[in-house]
């Protein structure tokens, strides 16, 4: 799926699926997503974490699925400066019909953990043209 919306605006690259129940991504911290001190903003990291969980839920639940984030809880544990590369891995912890829970970890170029999040998505189904 092509990058759209927030994913495109912030420059997140969701990588092709390697393993079911896992999503990998990367992005370079730019001044556009930095806080005033020259480091990646926490809001940008939260956006990546929720975006990854949504992408993973969509892969699992199918094209008619609309994963909607209903809870995100994160701890940012290390700063990443402008120009730094962030890599990320999301792992599905539970993938029921209506509820998915993901763990998402972000890493800097040295492989150090910079943020960890738990994301819960509710899975809604898109209505078909006949259902409208």
Please provide the spans of the model-predicted regions.
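Terminal targeting signals and extreme-terminal segments of soluble enzymes
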Residues: 1-132
């Amino acid at each position: 799926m092509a990058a759209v919306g927030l994913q495109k605006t912030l420059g997140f690259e969701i990588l092709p699926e390697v393993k079911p129940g896992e999503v990998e991504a990367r992005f370079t911290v730019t001044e556009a997503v930095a806080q005033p001190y020259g480091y990646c903003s926490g809001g940008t990291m939260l956006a990546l974490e929720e975006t990854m969980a949504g992408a993973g839920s969509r892969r699992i639940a199918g094209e008619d699925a609309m994963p909607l984030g209903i809870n995100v809880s994160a701890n940012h544990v290390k700063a990443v400066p402008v120009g730094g590369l962030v890599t990320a891995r999301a792992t599905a912890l539970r993938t029921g019909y209506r509820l998915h829970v993901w763990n998402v970890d972000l890493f800097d170029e040295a492989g150090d953990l910079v943020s960890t999040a738990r994301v819960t998505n509710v899975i809604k189904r898109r209505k078909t043209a006949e259902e409208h």
